[in-house]
């Protein structure tokens, strides 16, 4: 590591005093998090931090801060930071597709080739025409509305849609009322372009008598210059339309699925660099193959205030490549902590400590799912080749189950009727549905491996990766508690050869299993142990810990004993991570032990009501809205934070270090009723 980039921690050592830490934990309901609600059997309704190895602080001597995070979804805003360091915002919702000239090989009569005519998998079937949502059907350009009556125009567009999706096969013609002058060449060009941009697989032409006709495109009747659709995409700038996705209180994958259904394309045509939190306001980049900006812009419903889908699209551009998981530098967070009653000087002390020293780079609770049964516990069974145990956990009754989910799971356990249970179970329960459907078809309810393998491959991969994260969390807690905040001999750092980049391995986003990418594993060693004569050349911020795998090395000190001890609890061996099943033969990876927020700033504001919005969103800015807040006047106090984290770090873990507050959603919900009552 170069000395000019080296930043050492202050010489004043942060004292690891577990007795004081325990008092802070107990005061906030974090000690063993035993206060988490449970059902009559004692099973907790949700996982807590200690369940997944999160039980240490970098600076445990700081006081706790009483406050609530994510009280409103607008209290948690996330903006992607692209690979060039630009913060991604939604600033322009207009599509600016140019009309292509004849020089590109396009003529007045041209097919409308795009990816909309690709096959759609069964679970992504677009609605039939009668089910089609109004926002998916385009409207005629303004230049044509003056000559084509509204009723005729609407009927023509509906016919175009039916022809495009195959509900009708005969060519259609645009019949204008008598005494209506024929369209001139410019108007016909606009109409050709409109059809090309909005409907797939159609060819429009003007006959000698002036009749405008549209038919299904056949390769046979395409001019040679137009058989290669890349000609027009090249003129636009590339085959991939990149855009910014702004969403409110929705999952990234949920939004992508909705976009795919509305456009009638497979979800695989869309790509992102990473998912963003559901409960929040977020903006990120998305790329889609062979769909033009003008089609995407139709999904905005024409109104910011009446966006029916919970998301908006904009900032369109065309590029020659898609996005891959990890194609970002990080994320910028804007966070509100409400109902802060801790003295201001204590809050400032805690936040300055976070700013200066950072936090333990734990995998947050999101990594382990939202259920009371963590994905890592299923991962253990898989690594043990205990297929029955894994399947039983997936189908286990859980205290948080309600409605049709509870009914279906209870029915399965009382009758073992897979077919009847499957009829009740919502399709969104993908893993459970896959298992029951397999058994319903085969009738062999002892084929646990076969049933598990029917779960989509990418979802299956989440389980063993979650166990890796669990082990990492446990070891990180021990490392900070027992070896402190200085490097010691045998700690691992990135090798100069790898330049701080971990070896390539399958990337799994627990919120986006369909986006798992198989990347080649590097043959180069990406980490090395610190030798005795170079300990002073490194700081605690250089230390990395491995995620267990067949291609990693482990610390050359007592930390390795902790890996063995933790994994021995599950009868697993960190030095024996190869498996016959490629999916379970994990290569491993490396992760920084500590992370410091970049560009961190915070402010105190006053407010009167918990429903009051305290930070502006991109949507607010597009609507020219403003928020009136004061630093002096108001019934309650809130703290607003702004900082940037690398893509692999969790903002909730940064907040945990500063606030000493449990970040589990269930713990936060328990704080809400009293606060809401007090705000009335």
From Swiss-Prot:
Active site at 277
Region (Disordered), start-end ranges: 1-42, 99-136, 206-229
Compositional bias annotation for Basic and acidic residues? 1-30, 99-116
**GO biological process entries:** enzyme-directed rRNA pseudouridine synthesis; mRNA processing; pseudouridine synthesis; RNA splicing; snRNA pseudouridine synthesis; tRNA pseudouridine synthesis
> Looking at the keywords, is tRNA processing present?
yes
Span of domain TRUD:
358-596
In terms of superkingdom, the source organism counts as Eukaryota
Pfam name, any one: TruD
Q: What class of enzyme is it?
A: isomerase
Q: Give the PROSITE patterns listed for this entry.
A: TRUD (PS50984), UPF0024 (PS01268)
State where composition is biased (Polar residues): 206-216
- Recorded catalytic activity of this chain's protein: uridine in 5S rRNA = pseudouridine in 5S rRNA; uridine in snRNA = pseudouridine in snRNA; uridine(13) in tRNA = pseudouridine(13) in tRNA; a uridine in mRNA = a pseudouridine in mRNA
Q: What is its EC number?
A: 5.4.99.-, 5.4.99.27
Oxidoreductase as a keyword of this entry, yes or no, is no
Sorted UniProt keywords: Cytoplasm, Isomerase, mRNA processing, mRNA splicing, Nucleus, Ribosome biogenesis, rRNA processing, tRNA processing
Q: Where in the cell is it found?
A: Nucleus; Cytoplasm
GO terms for molecular function, please? pseudouridine synthase activity; RNA binding; snRNA pseudouridine synthase activity; tRNA pseudouridine(13) synthase activity
GO cellular component labels: cytoplasm; nucleus
TM segments? Answer: none
Q: Which NCBIfam families match?
A: tRNA_TruD_broad
Describe the function of this protein. Answer: Catalyzes pseudouridylation at position 35 in U2 snRNA stem-loop II region which induces particular conformation of the mRNA-U2 snRNA duplex and places the nucleophile in an accessible position for the first step of splicing. Also catalyzes pseudouridylation at position 56 in U2 snRNA. Also catalyzes pseudouridylation at position 50 in 5S rRNA, position 13 in cytoplasmic tRNAs, and position 35 in pre-tRNA(Tyr).
User: What family does this belong to?
Assistant: Belongs to the pseudouridine synthase TruD family.
User: What is this protein called in UniProt?
Assistant: Multisubstrate pseudouridine synthase 7
| Species lineage | Eukaryota, Fungi, Dikarya, Ascomycota, Taphrinomycotina
């Amino acid at each position: 590591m170069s000395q000019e980039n080296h930043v050492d921690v202050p010489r004043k050592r942060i004292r690891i005093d577990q007795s004081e830490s325990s008092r802070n934990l107990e005061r906030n309901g974090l000690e063993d998090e035993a206060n988490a609600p449970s059902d009559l059997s004692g099973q907790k309704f949700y996982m807590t931090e200690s369940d997944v190895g999160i039980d240490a602080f970098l600076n445990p001597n700081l006081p706790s801060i009483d406050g609530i995070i994510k009280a409103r979804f607008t209290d948690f805003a996330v903006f992607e930071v692209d690979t060039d360091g630009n913060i991604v915002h939604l600033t322009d919702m207009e599509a600016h597709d140019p009309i292509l000239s004849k020089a590109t090989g396009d003529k007045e009569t041209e097919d409308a080739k795009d990816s909309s005519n690709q096959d759609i998998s069964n679970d992504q079937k677009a609605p039939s025409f009668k089910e089609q949502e109004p926002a998916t059907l385009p409207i005629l350009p303004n230049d044509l509305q003056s000559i084509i009556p509204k009723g005729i125009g609407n009927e023509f567009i509906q016919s175009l849609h039916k022809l495009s999706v195959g509900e009708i096969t005969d060519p259609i013609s645009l019949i204008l009322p008598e005494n209506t002058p024929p369209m001139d060449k410019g108007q016909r060009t606009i109409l050709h372009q409109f059809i090309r941009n909005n409907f797939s697989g159609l060819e429009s032409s003007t006959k000698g008598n002036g009749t405008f006709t549209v038919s299904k495109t056949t390769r046979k009747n395409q001019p040679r210059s137009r058989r290669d659709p890349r000609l027009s995409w090249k003129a636009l700038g590339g085959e991939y339309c990149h855009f910014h996705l702004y969403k409110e209180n929705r999952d990234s994958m949920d939004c992508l699925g909705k976009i795919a259904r509305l456009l009638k394309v497979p979800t695989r045509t869309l790509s992102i660099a990473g998912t963003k939190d559901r409960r929040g306001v977020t903006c990120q980049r998305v790329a889609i193959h062979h769909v033009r900006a003008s089609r995407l812009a139709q999904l905005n419903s024409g109104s910011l205030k009446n966006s029916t889908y919970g998301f908006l699209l904009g900032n369109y551009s065309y590029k020659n490549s898609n996005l891959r998981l990890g194609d970002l530098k990080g994320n910028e967070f804007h966070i509100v902590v409400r109902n802060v009653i801790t003295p201001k000087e204590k809050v400032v002390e805690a936040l300055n400590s976070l700013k200066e020293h950072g936090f333990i780079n734990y995998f947050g609770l999101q990594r382990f799912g939202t259920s009371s049964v963590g994905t890592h516990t299923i991962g253990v069974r898989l690594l043990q080749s205990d297929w029955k145990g894994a399947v039983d956990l997936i189908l286990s009754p859980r205290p948080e189950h309600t409605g049709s989910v509870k009914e279906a799971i209870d029915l399965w356990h009382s009758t073992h009727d897979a077919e009847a249970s499957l009829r009740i179970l919502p399709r969104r329960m993908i893993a459970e549905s896959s298992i029951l459907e397999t058994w319903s078809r085969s009738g062999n309810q002892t084929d646990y491996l076969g049933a598990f393998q029917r779960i989509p491959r990418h979802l299956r991969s989440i389980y063993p990766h979650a166990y890796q994260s669990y082990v990492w969390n446990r070891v990180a807690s021990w490392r900070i508690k027992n070896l402190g905040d200085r490097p010691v001999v045998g700690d691992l750092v990135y090798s100069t050869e790898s330049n701080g980049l971990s070896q390539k391995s399958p990337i799994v986003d627990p919120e986006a299993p369909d986006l798992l990418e198989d990347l080649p594993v590097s043959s180069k060693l990406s980490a090395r142990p610190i030798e005795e004569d170079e300990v002073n050349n490194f700081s605690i911020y250089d230390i990395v810990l491995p995620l267990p795998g067949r291609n990693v090395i482990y610390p050359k000190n007592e930390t390795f004993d902790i890996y063995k001890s933790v994994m021995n609890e599950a009868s697993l061996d960190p030095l024996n991570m190869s498996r016959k099943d490629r999916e379970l033969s994990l290569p491993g990876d490396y992760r920084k032990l500590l992370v410091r927020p970049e560009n961190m700033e915070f402010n105190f504001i006053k407010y009167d009501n918990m429903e009051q919005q305290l930070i502006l969103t991109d949507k607010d800015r597009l609507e020219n809205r403003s928020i009136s807040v004061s630093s002096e006047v108001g019934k309650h106090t809130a703290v607003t934070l702004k900082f940037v984290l690398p893509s692999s770090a969790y903002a909730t873990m940064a907040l945990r270090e500063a606030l000493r507050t449990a970040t589990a959603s269930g713990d936060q919900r328990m704080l809400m009723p009293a606060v809401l009552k007090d705000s009335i």
